[in-house]
Amino acid sequence: MELKRVNQDFYVAGQITANDIVKIADQGIKTLICNRPDGEGADQPNVIEIEEAAQRHGLNVIYQPVISGKISDQQVTEFKQLYQNAQKPVLAYCRSGMR
């Protein structure tokens, strides 16, 4: 797992696992935003698994699934609102970290 810093309060990453949560928490991340729909890939953990691990380490999880290449203006607006209201720093993740 590689965290890419966008600014002081926002990071992106490819798919994370429950085992990554300790490292993420140690980096000071407070909120995870999952942009990957559950079931998109056979090898991905679902958001519930990530959320359970995150809660054990005091992290918040927001689930905003979007389909790669089909992100709507409404979803962009929703993401902006979720980010603005989230406890920071925020890590948004999907399969590649590019959504």
Model feature map: region roles:
Residues V90-R99:
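A phosphate-binding catalytic loop at a beta-strand-loop-alpha-helix junction
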